[in-house]
Amino acid sequence: MKRLFTAAALVALFAAAAFAGVQDFGKFTVDVPEGWTATADGETVGIVKNDNTASASITVSETEGSSLKEIADAFVQALGGKNLAADNGAYTFEFTNQNGVDSKAVLSGDDKNYALIIMTGVENAPDDFGKIINSLTEK
């Protein structure tokens, strides 16, 4: 299996966490932490901490001929993002969601597929976010 994300981009930010187990979402698998709930909706999977203090959404889709940079630019524009940066083959940016909460995004992929992870409440569960990102595996 191929990793969707290069761990080097985010390893320094996160440590280990306890996990409930690997869940299969069609195009990818991910370890969902204990105390979190995952729900699929089309190409997007939402993973929410049960106390609602943190969440992640993971979207895996086809690039349809666009470069990762073009896709990153489109998401930054659509979400009102800022601080777009390239990091080890991935792109990161920040934005404020519709509820006024600051969110962070990581976009990575290859010529065929991309994965976008949007994280909200990172400060409330940094270890869990690190494991979610590092466990994401394309099928």
Task: Briefly describe each language-model feature range.
Residues 40-126:
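Conserved polar/disulfide-associated segments of primarily extracytoplasmic proteins
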Residues 27, 31, 70, 74, ...:
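Extracytoplasmic/secreted proteins, especially bacterial periplasmic and envelope-associated proteins
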Residues 11-12, 28-33, 58:
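Short N-terminal leader segment in a subset of presequences, especially plant chloroplast
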Residues 36, 117-139:
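Surface-exposed amphipathic alpha-helical segments
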Residues 23-25, 74-80, 137:
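Alpha-helix C-terminal capping segments
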Residues 1-15:
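Sec-dependent N-terminal signal peptides
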Residues 21-41, 87, 136:
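N-terminal "mature-domain start" segment
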